[in-house]
Structures are given as structure tokens and as C-alpha cells.
């Protein structure tokens, strides 16, 4: 009930703040008492139509004390443990009265208000929250009934409170586990404790908060407990249930060293007692865990189920449109549950469902629907069913970070300050790229590490007792600055001296091994957390000089809203809730090593799109040796596996700088050197004989380096700069202020008569582009064939500069669709460029250009295109090649057309860094 004397505040009178994942609401009347604070300045600047929650990238637990002070103008008793961190927040928020109160407290002029219910109230509020607001995507609007209310932090982050998984009034302990760990220790996951499953992790319910020490041991093989740990009995009971021998032995030895029992009196580890691992010698298949999870929910929560798959059909996923899936997607960015990893498991899944009862009927129907034969939709109707969309992400992208039994919210900019964190494949997994991050570590310790990432300084509670565990965590993150900060920490030095003076063998001193250097490459990432009430990030500058936050207000960038969302409305710097990505290899896709995809899924499956690693921005990559294709899709890929290499190896674009006050020179394609060409077989080698103009060459097939002395004219690519250049991802942290000016030059695109409707090949460099499915790979260059130049030519340059912190983009295509779209574009442009390079007669080149044009404009079918193409002199024409090539073109052409529209939109929107074009008609002219 509402406490007497507390004025009721309507929703319109409340300001909402998301502080590091904790949600707070403050009445306007209370906040107005601090007119000089940044909280008031930022919140009061919002218009009534802006139903937004301001995001502050700071520690939410500490902000509870700020929140309490805003209500009462007093400090709570529990704040005394973290006065340094509280002072930092007050300084950054410019809460001068709170700073004065803290100074008075230091001088003994202020006494803390005893408030026993401080933290318990917060926990009760959050429990009530996730029972009341279960399975909805809207952020909570918890009514403020008492000044004791200290913010909402969802103790069970998924809020899966529907019967029967979490049908309890008690606090629910949870833990995020990497699937690799589950594979090693299957007893960790059971039908009763599994809450959710994704490609990289499993979320389980725990019996107690001490479960985190078990997970820490399984990672480090060390029992690291707080000083004077008193809950060893609870921990031991949980260990007994798991029946992991090495864990049981480690806990037994720890108890002996504590003095709880001697070697003679301490009982040996008992054999199996029918615990979780009984009968579980290996991990269950994913489909058994996923379907076993879903059958516990009512059909009303699941909605309409459907099965999705990769294009080769090897990996299946199940999802639905019910409130359960909507809620999970709001938290994790994805709601697909993985079912299979290989083609053979698809058959096992069918056999498994055949033996299930009526409770599995919705899953059976979904699988049957998925396996029904389907015909490809006509290409000319794709326009009505699909719309090209681009989502823009900035460095202020809000990322939810799940660590063990805790979760946090921060910005991509914070995670980028120390790139060693995200380049650590042993600790970091993306659940949804750039939106939700899984870190394999201790959740409580990560709070201190995250505060270091934010502030550049280590803030620890006064009575900190987990030094051995903190040392272990700091070592494993491989962040030199963090290691140095701990070494310089006075409290850490005191603890070391204390343990050395005690000289106790029972407590081996856990000294810190300082990391002197981290991984050499900077890897970056991706995408944004989407709330129905958009979070507008508020960025602290330097806390020591009390400068204001900066801000750019806007809605989430999608479809028609994107134009408004990208505009800067004020000089206060505060950018969109969007994120970042990393550089890669032109004309191919890039992959951030270790942290992007689940290694269980991408590493060893030939049916998956191959993965290429990037350690530097412009790394030249060699083709990978692949296993023989095992699926029909891979058989198609094998036919054209090297066709894309012409544009990224044999034909390399010159860089296209845009210096001011200098003329733009025509950029030409350069043929690779002989030694490099040998390693890249000509794309014509697999499907084309020697060129007509090169018949004097002895070999029946022209290699990549063959015919160079008779090589025809090199295609010219003219630079075209339709916009001010976007800041590259690798540069935004170094030169934010440097690139405010510097507009790039523009060149008009060719007139229609010059293009003569034969088409144009575009090379577009742009910020990293990811798929809409949250995959962790991306493109930075796109080479496309297009005939739609009129709308690009009519597009005026942007009237105002684009956001300086556009770090990556997302197309309305999945990663796999973009992958095959690029392959198709490279194939179409390659057969044209190859004909020019081989100095074919102009009649043959004109025929090739005409066929590509007719295929692209849908004047001929893919089958007719293949028949006519292979009938050209010099091409291999046999039935087997014809059928395979026809199937491949039919599959990939729709993706290529969609991708081309997205690139067109990217250019129109001024999001490209540079555009080069080559008009094909001039190579068909006589003389």
C-alpha cells in the first residue's frame, strides 16, 4: 500500500532512468529541487511526446543511494561501503548538494540515516516486477510508493515466471552457462532447471547463490571463496547433487584446510547418489533440450510455432510468435532455439518427434510444414513481400551483458575502451551480435571490472573479501591497465601484506600475475538493444571537470524513421542507442575471432558458410581448404566457390581517398602479380575454356596469370563520393573531433545516354554491414551489378552531416542471404570483367553484358540465362554444369537483387564512405 504522506505522481510527472540495467523513476517535483544537476537538465529537455527512458552508463547499484538522496536529501546507511563510487557519480551528475553531504560525512559533520530495509526492498520490488510484468516487452513502470524504493534490477533476467518453470514466490537464482561448458559437464543442465537455450549459452535455475563458485571452479579448476566463507555446507550440498568428481574432491580438500574436519574424520567423496548426472554420460542433443523446454509452456504462451533453417538445411531452429518468444527476444535479441547442428541430426529429430505424445503435436506440425516441398517464389513478386531497410548503429549502442548470475547494461563505447575484453575468445560470446553479450566469468566480480571500464579506475567496497577470485578474474580478462590498477590498489596491497604476515599454508596467497600485453588485434562488433521505450544514452565526459553530457535525441533507426533518428538536434552530444563492428577483407566477409560465433557451430561444419578471420583491417586472406561437399547446397557452392575471387584478388580496386582541394583521378582495376595469381585460379578455369582472343596460348584452360601479354584494356572505375565520408570503425575512438569538417568531393554519375542501359558495376565501401539475424560476421565492401542509376543520380547530397559515430549498419537480410547475394554479384560482375580482361571480341563481351542485363531485369529466366551463357564460344557446355549452374543462379539471384536494393538505399542515404563505378557500355564501343 502507498505510505501516508507520499504524494501520488502520475506517469506524466515521472522521469525514467536506466542506470546500467537498473530502472529508476523520479518525480519531476523531486528532481526539480536539483536544477543544476545533469539529471534535471537532460530530463527536463525532453518533450512530452518523447516517451523515453534516459540511459546512464554507470553503476546501478550505487545509483540506488543517489535515488534515495533525491527523495529524502539524506544518505542511507548502506552507502558507507561505497562512498568513493558514490562520490564519483555525484560528481559526474553535478549533484552539488550530495557532494557537499559526502564532504561533510568525511569531516564527521553528517550522520548516516539507518535504513535496514535498504537492499531487501530493492529485491522485493524486482521480484514483484517479474511476476507482475512477465512475458511483456515494455519496460516496467513500477509505482513509487515509498522513498525506500531503490530501483528495479531483474533478478531473473528473462522473467520466465509462467508455470511451471518458475512458479515460486521465492527469489530465483539463475546462471548463464556457455554451451561448451554444458558439453563438458552435462549434469549442469536438467529438464527441471533449464530456463532457455541459445546457440552460445544455456540459462539455468540454480538452487543457491553459491552456485557461482561451482561455475568458477569448472572454468579455472580452483576453489576461490571469500575470506571467512560461512556457507560451505550449502555449497557442499549443491556439489553433491552435481556429482562432478574433481569438484567434489576440491571442496572436500578445502573443508579440510579450513579445519572443518581432518583427513581422518572427513568422509571420502561418496559414489553416485542418484544426482543430476545419473544416467547422463553425454550431453543431450539440442533438440531434446529445446523441445523439452517448450512442452512445459501452454500453447497460448508459445503461439504459432515455426521451424527455420540455414539455406543448406543442416541447422534447424524453432521459434514462435507467442508472448514467451516476444519476451525472450526483448531480453536476448533472439528467440530462436537451436535444434540441430548437422544434417544427420535432422533425421534424428524426425525420429524423436515420431515417438512423442500429443504434447509435442505443435512441434510435429511445425516440422512437417517446414519439410514440405516448396517452390521458389517468382522473382517479380519479391518487391511486394520485402522492403529494403537499413538500421544504423552508433558507439552509444546499449548492450546487455550477461555474466554468470548477473546482468548489466553498458554502451559499446565503454566496451571499446579496452579492446582486449572483446578480443578474448575464451571469455566472450555474442548471444546477439552487438546487442546481448555473454561473458564467461563471475557476475559479482564483473561489476567491479565494468566500473573500471567505465571510469578507468578500480572502485572496490570498503569490506571487500573476495581477493583471490578478483585476482583470478583480472588475470583471465587480459587487460593490462586493469591488472596494473589492481596492483596499485592500496586495499589489495594491504591484503597481500596481511596474508604474507599470517604465513598460513591453509590459505595459499593468490598473487596477481600482471598482464603486460594483450591480443594484438582490435576486434569490434555490433547491434543494439531495442526497448519499446527507447533508451537515450547519456554519456559522462571526464568526471573531474564536471562537463555536461552530450546528446543526440532520436528514435530507433528503422525504415522511415531512420532519417529523423540520425539527425543531431542539439550540441549536447548524446547519440542513438546503437553499436559497433569491426573491419574486414574487401569483397569478402569478415569475422571477429573467438567472440562472434559459437565455436561449436562454426568451426567444423562444412555445410556452414566458411569462416574467415580478420586480425587487421586490410588483411589479405587465402582461400581455405574445404572438406568435400556433403549437402546439395555445398555442391552448388563448389561449382562457383572461386568465382568471387576475381573482384577481390585478380581485380583490385585502387584506394579512393578524398583529399581536399585536389583533383580526383580515375581509379582503375589492377591485375594481380603473377605469383599471387597462381594461388588464385582463374574463375574461368572451372567453367570456361580459353578465350577466343587467346587461342594461341597452349593450355586448354587459361590460368589467372595466363594471357597477360595479350590482356585487353583494364576496366576503369571512376570515383564517386555522394556524401561526407563516414568515420571508419577503427578510427572513431581516435579522431572524433577531427572529422567534423572534410566533406568529400562529388562526381555526377553518368547520364542515361552514357550508361545506355547496359548496367554499371559499383564498388561501394561502407561501414561494416551485418545481417538482421544478429550474426557476428560482416562486409565492409560491396561490388554489385546494377541498372538502377537514375534514382542515385537524382539523390541530392545530405543537407546535414551524418552522425560521426556510425560504427556499423544492418541490412534487412540475414547473414546467410547476404553471403550468397555477394557470391551472385561477384559471379555476374566476374564473367563481364573476365571477358574484358581476356580481350574477347567485342561481340562476345556484348553478348555477356546483354545476358547479365536481361537476367537482372528479369527479361529472361535463370535457366535461359545459363543456356545462352554456356552456348557462347569458349564456355564449357555440358548438361551437368548447366543444371548445377541453373540451380545456383535461381537460388542466389533473389538475394542478390535484394542486396543490391539495400546498397542503393545505403548510397541514397549517404552512408557510404566512397563509391566507384565502371560503365560497361564504353567497353563495347568500336575503336
UniProtKB/Swiss-Prot annotation:
Any Pfam family: BTB_2
Annotated positions of the Phosphoserine modification: 270
Source species, domain of life: Eukaryota
InterPro entries (UniProt xref): SKP1/BTB/POZ_sf, T1-type_BTB
Example GO biological process: cell differentiation
Keyword Repeat: yes
Cellular compartment(s): Nucleus
Gene Ontology cellular component terms for the protein in this record: nucleus
Keyword Disulfide bond in record: no
Residue ranges of domain BTB in the record: 18-72, 399-486
Keyword terms: Activator, Differentiation, Meiosis, Nucleus, Phosphoprotein, Repeat, Spermatogenesis, Transcription, Transcription regulation
Residue ranges of the region described as Disordered: 603-631, 662-718
Assembly and binders: Identified in a complex with ZNF541, HDAC1 and HSPA2. Identified in a complex with ZNF541 and HDAC1. Identified in a complex with HDAC1, HDAC2, DNTTIP1 and ZNF541.
Name this protein carries in UniProt: BTB/POZ domain-containing protein KCTD19
Organism, scientific name: Bos taurus (Bovine)
